[in-house]
């Protein structure tokens, strides 16, 4: 099968019998639902860019499994050049959508699974690696979107999986059959899960022997029997339900998506099981996935940041403040922060190395440094954007007010006339509507629906800040640095 277009991808979702719930109701036509559709449009961009000759080098790759041309989101990295192209591809997709385009988690899961299953097989004589390669060939051949599912609800964080009051708070193997396993539990915060054809489930943390039932990794289709999803809310999400909504959305065409994915006794055939009780490899899988995903943030968040910086510059221009030295300095600082994130993403890619199975992995220390910076810099970037934009970003009347023909003035002025009069700014550079549009975009990305992906996801996605600090401590080689200091200081 040839690579799909964005339109073909969207149509492929209609063939699935995915169970989706929102606001306490089952959503029958979720593909066209106004709250969900922008997130589908985002994923569609990753297909359309792969069809564009201008972006072919970044968006496509040659499969190491089949030798065929595939979408890079389904590729196993074969070199440091592949790792760098991944980051550049993610920046491009962020620039084109100003949103989370949802395919990075699956790509990072593929690469973590590929090397980890090889090492499990080496120790235990299992055939997980061959199973996974066959599954990945299927994904590549059909150009599918796969949700990488790692985060469990976790319950009481002070307790191990087996010690929880409710055993379902971590995904677990409930039953082992001759032809497969039955799994139960849920995965939280799942980016793009509803827009995915399949799910690739991984353990959420390192495990001990008593937690071996929770050391499970598998793949299953989105419409598997017993699987259903409950859509997560975002700030200002119901604006998308307003009749004729456009300007007030800030980003009408694109958006992100998260959901709770529930596995209610789902049967997984053996061919799609890639870990089943090998608890001593759960930590390796988590660590490698986290490293890849922390690298990803040096690409996707940078692309979104490019749009935020551009919007802030436009807001300054439309306000007539673009020549002010302090505004220029703020834009310089925003650019400095954004490019620092990109530098980290490229650095951890450039310092990558081959794994035992031949695929390439990033430098884990630098990947964690990358994500640690991502937990901070987007917050400062949006703070500066709000500073430049001014208070109107959050006090502006609605689009309907600007278009209203209701007469309110002594001389026959309408609400629309009044709004357009008093909210005009640098009229030589922009219309009042254009000013509205850029301010609504900034509202959306700074504290609206898109803030989920640019702010809070930057904090907690791919691991919360302390998770990176733990890895930096492990990888930082303090003893080696102490030895260097002793040698220079003349200490025996």
Feature map (PLM): residue ranges:
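Extended amphipathic alpha-helical segments enriched in small hydrophobics
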Residues: 296-355
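Alpha-helix capping/hinge segments and adjacent helical runs
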Residues: 365-492
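FAD-binding core of flavoproteins
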Residues: 148, 153-300, 470-492
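N-terminal low-complexity or amphipathic/hydrophobic leaders
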Residues: 28-91, 356, 457-461
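N-terminal-proximal low-complexity accessory segments that begin disordered
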Residues: 1-49
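Glycine-rich flavin
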Residues: 61-198, 203-218, 223-228
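Generic structural signal for well-ordered, non-transmembrane alpha-helical segments
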Residues: 41, 137-140, 182, 303-306, ...
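Short, charged, amphipathic alpha-helical segments
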Residues: 328-332, 360-368
